[in-house]
Amino acid sequence: MPTWTDIKDHARSSYKLADEHDHSFKVVFEYPGNRLQAVIASHYHAMGRSWVDFSSACCRADRLDPQAALRQSFNLAVGSLCLDGDVYVVRHTVMVEHLDLADLEVSMHAVARAADQIEQSLPIYEPASDKVSDVEEERV
C-alpha cells in the first residue's frame, strides 16, 4: 500500500511537476495541436481514510449547458464531470490504500484526456457583445 509520499515521489520521477505543495502536485500533459491539460492530484483525509483526488479543468460553467454536462459525465469511463465554482472539472477520487502506483499514471491520463476531449467538443466561444463593449470602455 503506497503512502502519499510514495505517490508524490513516483509522480516526481515520472513527470516534470508543474507545481508541488505538501498535499498536492500538478502535472501538465501536452496533446496534439499544442493543447495543454493540467491535472492536479490532491491528498486529503475523509471517513478515517487517506484519499487522492485527480482533477482537471475543462471549461467555464457558462460554456456548457447543465444537461449536456450530465450527459458528458455519464459517458466518462473514469471519474465524473463536476462544477467547482464557475468551472467544470473532470474529477476522479481513489483511496490511497487501493491505488497501485502504475494506476497513478492511468488515473492522471484518463482525467486529462477526458477534460481535453470535453473542451475540444465545445463550440468556439464568442463573448456576448455587451461584455466586449464593457471591456473596451474600461480600456479607454
Walk through the language-model features, giving the residues of each.
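Ampiphathic alpha-helical segments that act as solvent-exposed interaction surfaces
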Residues: 70-77, 93-125
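Short, surface-exposed charged micro-motifs
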Residues: 16, 40-42, 78-82
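Short, internal acidic amphipathic alpha-helical interface segments
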Residues: 48-93
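Short, well-structured hydrophobic secondary-structure segments
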Residues: 32-54
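Generic alpha-helical secondary structure
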Residues: 4, 8, 62-63, 104
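Short, highly charged C-terminal tails/helix-capping segments
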Residues: 122-140
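Short, surface-exposed beta-strand-loop junctions and turns on beta-sheet-rich folds
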Residues: 33-34, 60, 96-98
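Charge-rich, low-complexity N-terminal segments
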Residues: 1-36, 83
